[in-house]
Amino acid sequence: MLSTQFNRDNQHQAIIKPSLLAGCIALALLPSAAFAAPATEETVIVEGSATAPDDGENDYNVTSTSAGTKMQMTQRDIPQSVTIVSQQRMEDQQLQTLGEVMENTLGISKSQADSDRALYYSRGFQIDNYMVDGIPTYFESRWNLGDALSDMALFERVEVVRGATGLMTGTGNPSAAINMVRKHATSREFKGDVSAEYGSWNKERYVADLQSPLTEDGKIRARIVGGYQNNDSWLDRYNSEKTFFSGIVDADLGDLTMLSAGYEYQRIDVNSPTWGGLPRWNTDGSSNSYDRARSTAPDWAYNDKEINKVFMTLKQRFADTWQATLNATHSEVEFDSKMMYVDAYVNKADGMLVGPYINYGPGFDYVGGTGWNSGKRKVDALDLFADGSYELFGRQHNLMFGGSYSKQNNRYFSSWANIFPDEIGSFYNFNGNFPQTDWSPQSLAQDDTTHMKSLYAATRVTLADPLHLILGARYTNWRVDTLTYSMEKNHTTPYAGLVFDINDNWSTYASYTSIFQPQNDRDSSGKYLTPITGNNYELGLK
């Protein structure tokens, strides 16, 4: 039994003991494995390596993907820059979080803010949403809910489409779309993998990935992925503890119908995380240098996150070459943190801190602050689409059309306090032994709800054997309600691409894609500014 309580004081215990994790998961699946086969006297030996993986799990590529257009195509057929990071590559390169995947993906750069926060960019713009199974979640860099810390053991692959991706996401920056594809129960026999890892900075990591049929014919299958990780860091006092779990059931309801349903849980507890960086400059204008272990985090600082998601997918095949897909999800992400930052210059003579605003007058001599932030992000989303092929003028073409609805509520609370030079003393002697703030009650910092309704369609027309034209569009109705205003915008996002197959191995393409981003600023007459539009013109060779 897992029991969690999100808020904590100065101490907390691990949610689940790592030594029990693999055993609990295995015991959960063993009854179903026994039920699926007649009882025998044979001895079953479980070794540390998995059985033969499903087709594609041991490869760096996939045969087809819906990235970019939602139509199943090869990467060569997509008129945009696409990278697929497969499960095998993530295992080989030890890419264990979404952030680590993005750091190792072509065309994506990283700006590290502190120990746990990083911003990711593509083509000069910040990536401001992530997708799971094609359903986007939008986030603000102001609030750190741990999206980039999602554990990759729960996912089959990550699809990255660079540039404007309005056909897929609706709103956002013309940077990139990141789509995480969940693992499913694909095996009709019991199989799995249990691993343990030990490394620098007292790192220990345990992961179990088990599959089993729930019926004798294997038409109903289950997959459980669970893990635990604990590690320190080169930073003084820092410790991170993570527990993650995903359970999914896949059922073949008939020859043409498949239903999947599952639950995902992640919890990340960080002790003594930094909030911003170290003081860069001295009062005389010279720069500081520090040991890399140096940290501004006090002993009591923490940053905890908890993720709960339920999800469902229904797929129905019909007319031989057509398939309808319904994806639905409900997710709740909570965070609670108490942290401290330093924003000051250092007096080289005695190590005392001098605030950057001291010349503003009395009360402006503070050199940093503490913050108690907490909140929840809730997302409810539906996505229904159909894709398939049709014949016209003696040639085969592809068509995709559908609609989506999402509701996202962000509700955050804060309490702040300033820190003055005498409280810290000489920064040269700072070792984290700093008294915790006498916190004032939290106040509401943000409460908004965003509704997005979309209709979209795209087609891939074969103009000649080597020449393919892709046309598409997405119509989006976007509305946000906050404590002080409401705003609604409608926007149509076009998509066009042309792909020419040079030979069996090479293609060249040209494309125009777009995306839009609503603004909450107003002009002098009080009207909201028109949305920012991002346009992407691209030529490429694959």
Describe the predicted segments one by one.
Residues 138-139, 154-156, 167-247, 253-257:
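Outer-membrane beta-barrel translocator/receptor signature
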Residues 194-198, 224-228, 261-265, 326-330, ...:
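Transmembrane beta-barrel strands of outer-membrane/channel proteins
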Residues 229-233, 246-317, 332-377, 422-444, ...:
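Acidic/polar loop-and-plug regions of large Gram-negative outer-membrane beta-barrel proteins
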Residues 82, 90, 101-102, 158-163, ...:
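Non-catalytic regulatory/gating segments with a bias toward low-complexity or hydrophobic composition
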Residues 110, 119, 135-162, 181-182:
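Short acidic/polar hinge/loop motifs at secondary-structure boundaries
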Residues 61-83, 93, 99-136, 156:
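Extracytoplasmic beta-strand/coil segments of soluble accessory domains associated
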Residues 252, 377-379, 396-400, 404-408, ...:
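Structural signature of Gram-negative outer-membrane beta-barrels, strongest in the C-terminal barrel
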Residues 36-87:
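Short, acidic, small-residue-rich periplasmic hinge/interaction motif at the N-terminus
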